[in-house]
Structures are given as structure tokens and as C-alpha cells.
Amino acid sequence: MSFNTLIDWNSCSPEQQRALLTRPAISASDSITRTVSDILDNVKTRGDDALREYSAKFDKTEVTALRVTPEEIAAAGARLSDELKQAMTAAVKNIETFHSAQTLPPVDVETQPGVRCQQVTRPVSSVGLYIPGGSAPLFSTVLMLATPARIAGCQKVVLCSPPPIADEILYAAQLCGVQEIFNVGGAQAIAALAFGSESVPKVDKIFGPGNAFVTEAKRQVSQRLDGAAIDMPAGPSEVLVIADSGATPDFVASDLLSQAEHGPDSQVILLTPDADIARKVAEAVERQLAELPRADTARQALSASRLIVTKDLAQCVAISNQYGPEHLIIQTRNARDLVDAITSAGSVFLGDWSPESAGDYASGTNHVLPTYGYTATCSSLGLADFQKRMTVQELSKAGFSALASTIETLAAAERLTAHKNAVTLRVNALKEQA
């Protein structure tokens, strides 16, 4: 189906409607699963030697020193323009402001007299950040991951990226307080972070995007007892735009294309009650597409994308909630009024002047977001992902005495005798003291 084909939602059967919102398949092939499993086991067994072999095989790079030196990082920064460094600093300032505001206040309450309950927050001790390489290094992801890690107070923050690591990535890592950087990419980097090697430290939790092999490696290590936790399930990028008759077609088209250029498996959807706007957006997409260096990639993504005409904006919101997009852009005259009705989205962009690019780089929100429908149960990345919450309780003698019979009754009902005894013994001890 061509992206300039308008689809009348209300003329479609329920089966057709479900098909329109179906995402491209992303399940890992058996060969990827087996290859990744072998890589994980090899890195765990052979450490740095395996990492160097995989760099030569996959990255076509002979790596002598896996760890990047401070001198190399300084040299990378010197090669960058002041304009870019200033832009990174400005972005980090906004990211810091937004994520610092997410700090949870401690909870300290008496649930009843003499029964004190608390919730306290602690940082994840060590985290590993994975940043893909390639022709367009995602240094902005360094800002999005390393900044909240620093605010959270993570004691060890390390980064892996395929060699040779781009200057922008090295500078961004230094700017955000990353302590160690390693010339390691792919599934082997995930293995090194999960299990540790002679050079790369083992971490508690791994963050960051990647290709099918990286995604599968993260999935596998998260399910191994000797592995590591991960940030969230990953899938292709996606955007859904809700537009009304007052939307600017060129703006809408540019937002759709900014997502489509990410990769051929990205998906973009336009929902609008105005067929004329849909037609104008399709025309604007074609005009802008002709000027994009990554036009071939974007065109492939558009083949799985949709222009859908609805009855009204309320129906647009209902369809969006059903789909649960990673990015939701609302270009309507009442954009703010629609927010309360949105139930599933990774990040929402309101009005004509809030392009997705703002959140991708510098507004302050995090651009690491749940995709592939995981917005139904997962949140956008934030400070809490680099922290853990712990509860504390303390009962005075009087508080314990008042609660004892309740605990004994509940424990007896569950036939957990030792639980009941732990209370009864203390009750008897208090009676003896009286």
C-alpha cells in the first residue's frame, strides 16, 4: 500500500482495522538467537581475547587497547567545533533540569500508632551504556543515558561502542561524567557488560539501543542468572501524528519523515478527520523526501506506514491509544485539551512548535522510549530506571502489640505456622516482661 493512499477508518472491517495497526515483525530468527548465544558464552569464557576477535570479524578493526585513554578523549573533543560542543552543553542543561525534577521524596509514615513505614531510594550501583556506531553516531543517546545515571548517583558508569568510536560520542561521554569507555560493539559488548572481562567491568544494568543482534543479546542476558538487567524491550522507531484542519502539512510531513529516516522498519501513521489535510501531507512528504540524503531508507519505512481518515478527533485519540505509539505528535488547535484522554504513548508532543526532534535532542525529556506497543505497560526512560526503591519498617513494642493478633490471624489462615510463631513468641515475651 502506498503512503499516499488515504484510508477511511470507518469503511474498514474490524479485521482490516487491526491489520492497519499491525507493526512490522521483529522477532529474532533462529540463526540470530543461536549466534548471539554463542557470542555470549564465548565472551564469558575467553574475555578480552574473544572481544578482539569479534572486533576484527564484525567491525573490521584490530583493537589493541579496549579501553579508550583520557588522551584520546581529549583529542576527540579538540577536533569538534565549538558550536557543536555548546549545543551539547545546552541540551545537557535541559536534560538535567527535567530529570533532577524526577527525584522522589522519601516516604515516612505511621500506618498506625507505633508502626513506622518508609520508602527510600538508592542508585543502581553500576550501569553500562551501549551506543551504536555506524555512519550516523547517536551521541545524543549518550546525553540521554549518562545524564540521569549521574543524577541518580550510580557509582560506576561505563560505555561501549563499536570501534572506531566517533569523536562526538567520546566528547558526550566525557561531558556527562562517564568514567570508562571501551572499543567494543555488537552482541559482544552486551556480553562484556553482563559478564565482565579482563578489561570491561561487569555491570548491574545495561542501557541503550542497537541492531537485531544487540537487542537479542540484551534479551538473553536479562534472562540469565549470571547476566544483567536491561532498560526495556526494544523495537523499531515509530511516530503517530494526530492533525486537524488547522495543521501545517509541511510540519506534519517533516515529523513523519524524521521518524521514517531512522530505518526501513520504522513506522509512521497519520490520523486526521480531514481528508484534505491527509492529501496535502502526502504531497508534502513526496516533496521533502526528494531532498533527503536518507530518502531510500525513509521510502522503505513509508511502505508500512498509513494515512488514516477518521470521523473526528475523539476517534483519532481512541485509535492512538489502541496503537500506543513511541512518539505521539498532536498538531491540533486544542492539543493540550486532548492530553487527559491519552493513555498509551512513550512521549507526547503538543502543537505546531513541538517537533519530535525537540525531544530527541534538547527539550529535556528522554528520547529512550518504549516501542512496539510496550507503551501499554512501560514508561519512557527516566531517573527511576537508574534507581531502586527500598522499604523500611520499625515497630515499637506498643505498635507490635496492637498489630500482633492481626498478623497471627492472617498467618494462620495461610497455614504458615512459622510466620505465626514469630509473632506469638514475641507476644509471650512481652507478657513475661509485664
UniProtKB/Swiss-Prot annotation:
Regulation: Activity is lost when the metal is removed through urea denaturation or chelation, and can be regained by addition of metal.
EC number annotated for this UniProt entry: 1.1.1.23
Gene3D superfamilies: 1.20.5.1300, Nitrogenase molybdenum iron protein domain
Chain residues that bind Zn(2+): Q259, H262, D360, H419
The entry's keywords: Amino-acid biosynthesis, Histidine biosynthesis, Manganese, Metal-binding, NAD, Oxidoreductase, Zinc
Biological-process GO terms, alphabetical: L-histidine biosynthetic process
Superkingdom to which the source organism belongs: Bacteria
Gene Ontology CC: cytoplasm; cytosol
Active site location: E326, H327
Annotated family: Belongs to the histidinol dehydrogenase family.
SUBUNIT field: Homodimer.
Protein name: Histidinol dehydrogenase
